[in-house]
C-alpha cells in the first residue's frame, strides 16, 4: 500500500489528550517535516523504533501544539507499516489543526477502519481478530470485553485452524490417491475418513452451540417488558435503570413507542425494552405501539410481564399470557401496596412461570427479580470459562455452511459414492471455515466489514 494515511484516533470531544495516528511508508517523512524537538537538534527520522519524544508540531513557522511523538518502525506495529502516533492536547480544534498539518505534509485522510484493514491485509491479524477490535470498542459488559479480547488474541482463529488442518490433510490425501492410485491406496479409507468427519463436525457443532450465549454476551439479553396500560411497566423500567427515562402518569396508554435501555446484571448486559400497554384501541398511534410490542415479544430472550394486582384479569391479560408460551418469562405481581384483586397463585397456575411480588412505587422486589433472572438464564451462576464463544453472525453463518458440507461428506461415505465426491464437500467445508479467518472472502466483503469501523481505528 503506497499511500500514507492519518486520522484522529480519539473521540472528537474535549479531553486531556488527543491522538493522531499516521501509518504508511512515508510516515517518517511526514513527521520529520512538522516535528521539532525542544532543543531543535533531534532528527526524528533517526531515533530508534518504539521510542517517545517530547517536542512541538509546526505548520511552517507557526507553532500548532506541544506534543509527545511515538515512533514505531515496521514490521512490529499494529498495521505492519511504519507508524507514528502524535499525542497532542485533546481540544477538538487542537486535534483538527494537528491533523490538517499532517495531511498538508504528505498523508491522506484514512477511511473508517483503514488502520485495522491494513493490519489484516499485511498479515498482522486474521479477519476474526480484526472484527474483534470493533467488538472490544463496543463491549457493553465484562463478559463481552473478555470474549472480544480472547478473540483478538486468537481464540477463534486457533479453533478454526485446528479443524481446517485436519480437513486439508484428508483433502490432499484423497487428491493424491486419485492422481496416483498405484502407490496410494484408498482401501478402507472411507471408514477412516468417516471418523475424522464425525470428530471435526462435533467441534463445528460445539462452536455453533456457543453462538446463542455468544450473542447474549455481545448484544445483551433482549428483555421485553409487557403488560396492560398503566400496569407499571414504565415505572419498572425507570427503577431498573436508575433514572426517569420513561414518562410515568396515571393516564393509561402514555407509552406509545418502544423505549430501550441497557443495564448490567452480574457482568451481563440486559437490553430492557419498555413497550406500549397491550389492549384493543382505535387510536392509530397507540395501535402501532401495541403492534410493535407484540413483535418485540416474539423476538425476546426474556419477557417481564407486569401485572397490576389491584385490578382483575381480563381478555388483554389472556392475550399476554398466550404470548408467553414457549418463552422464558417472569411474572411481576405489581402494586403490592394496594388491595389485591388477584392472587399470585392464580398467575403461577395460569402461566407456569415464576411470580415475584413487587412494588415499583415503593421500590420493592427488585433484588428478588435480579436473582430470578440470574437463576432462569444462567442456572443461578454467571461464569465465564475458557470456552471459545461465537459472537459474530458472519462466523455463525460460515460454521453452518461448513456443518452442511460435512453432512454431505458423511452421506457420500455411507452411500458408497466415489472418493472425489468426498473431496469436493471437504473443500467446501474448508473454504467456508476459511471465510471466518478472511482466507476465502472477496474484496467487497472485506470493504463492507471495515466500513463499519470508527475513524482512526
Indicate where each model-derived feature is located.
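A glycine-rich (often HGG/GG-containing) alpha/beta subdomain
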Residues: 1-146, 150, 154, 330
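Short glycine-/polar-rich loops that comprise or flank the Walker A/P-loop
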Residues: 15-17, 50-52, 299-303, 326-329, ...
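Conserved beta-strand segments of alpha/beta enzyme cores
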Residues: 108, 269-271, 354
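Short glycine-/small-residue-rich Rossmann-like dinucleotide-binding loops
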Residues: 241, 276-277, 301, 308, ...
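Generic enzyme active-site microenvironment
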Residues: 272, 306, 332
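Inter-motif core of Ras-like GTPase G domains
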Residues: 286-310
Amino acid at each position: 500500500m503506497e499511500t500514507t494515511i492519518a486520522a484522529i484516533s480519539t473521540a472528537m470531544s474535549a479531553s486531556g489528550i488527543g491522538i493522531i495516528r499516521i501509518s504508511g511508508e512515508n510516515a517518517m517523512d511526514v513527521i520529520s517535516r512538522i516535528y521539532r524537538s525542544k532543543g531543535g537538534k533531534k532528527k526524528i527520522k533517526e531515533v530508534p523504533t518504539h521510542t517517545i519524544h517530547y517536542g512541538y508540531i509546526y505548520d511552517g513557522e507557526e507553532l500548532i501544539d506541544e506534543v509527545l511523538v511515538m515512533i514505531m518502525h515496521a514490521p512490529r506495529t499494529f498495521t505492519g507499516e511504519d507508524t507514528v502516533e502524535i499525542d497532542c492536547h485533546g481540544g477538538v480544534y487542537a486535534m483538527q489543526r494537528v491533523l490538517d498539518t499532517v495531511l498538508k505534509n504528505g498523508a491522506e485522510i484514512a477511511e473508517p477502519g483503514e488502520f485495522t484493514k491494513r493490519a489484516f491485509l499485511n498479515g498482522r491479524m486474521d479477519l476474526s481478530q480484526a472484527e474483534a477490535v470493533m467488538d472490544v470498542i463496543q463491549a457493553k459488559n465484562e463478559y463481552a470485553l473478555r470474549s472480544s479480547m480472547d478473540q483478538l488474541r486468537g481464540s477463534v482463529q486457533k479453533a478454526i485452524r485446528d479443524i481446517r488442518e485436519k480437513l486439508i490433510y484428508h483433502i490432499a490425501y484423497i487428491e493424491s490417491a486419485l492422481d496416483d492410485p498405484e502407490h496410494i491406496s484408498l482401501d478402507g479409507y472411507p471408514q477412516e475418513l468417516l471418523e475424522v468427519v464425525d470428530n471435526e463436525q462435533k467441534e463445528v457443532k460445539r462452536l455453533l452451540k456457543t453462538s446463542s450465549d455468544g450473542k447474549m454476551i455481545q448484544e445483551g439479553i433482549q428483555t421485553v417488558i409487557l403488560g396492560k396500560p398503566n400496569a407499571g411497566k414504565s415505572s419498572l423500567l425507570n427503577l431498573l435503570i436508575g433514572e426517569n427515562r420513561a414518562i410515568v402518569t396515571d393516564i393509561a396508554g402514555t407509552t406509545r413507542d418502544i423505549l430501550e435501555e441497557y443495564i448490567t446484571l452480574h457482568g451481563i448486559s440486559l437490553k430492557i425494552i419498555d413497550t406500549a400497554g397491550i389492549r384493543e384501541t382505535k387510536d392509530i398511534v397507540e395501535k402501532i405501539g401495541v403492534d410493535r410490542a407484540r413483535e418485540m415479544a416474539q423476538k425476546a430472550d426474556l419477557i417481564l410481564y407486569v401485572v397490576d394486582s389491584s385490578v382483575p384479569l381480563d381478555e388483554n391479560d389472556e392475550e399476554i399470557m398466550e404470548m408467553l408460551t414457549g418463552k422464558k418469562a417472569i411474572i411481576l405481581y405489581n402494586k403490592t401496596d394496594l388491595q389485591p384483586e388477584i392472587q399470585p397463585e392464580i398467575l403461577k397456575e395460569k402461566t407456569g412461570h415464576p411470580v415475584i411480588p413487587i412494588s415499583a412505587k415503593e421500590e420493592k422486589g427488585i433484588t428478588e427479580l435480579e436473582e430470578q433472572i440470574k437463576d432462569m438464564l444462567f442456572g443461578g451462576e454467571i461464569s465465564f470459562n475458557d470456552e471459545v464463544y461465537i459472537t459474530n453472525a458472519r462466523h455463525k453463518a460460515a460454521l453452518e455452511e461448513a456443518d452442511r458440507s460435512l453432512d454431505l461428506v458423511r452421506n457420500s461415505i455411507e452411500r458408497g459414492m466415489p472418493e472425489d465426491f468426498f473431496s469436493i464437500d471437504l473443500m467446501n467445508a474448508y473454504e467456508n471455515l476459511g471465510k471466518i479467518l478472511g482466507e476465502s472472502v472477496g474484496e467487497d466483503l472485506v470493504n463492507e466489514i471495515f466500513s463499519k469501523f470508527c475513524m482512526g481505528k
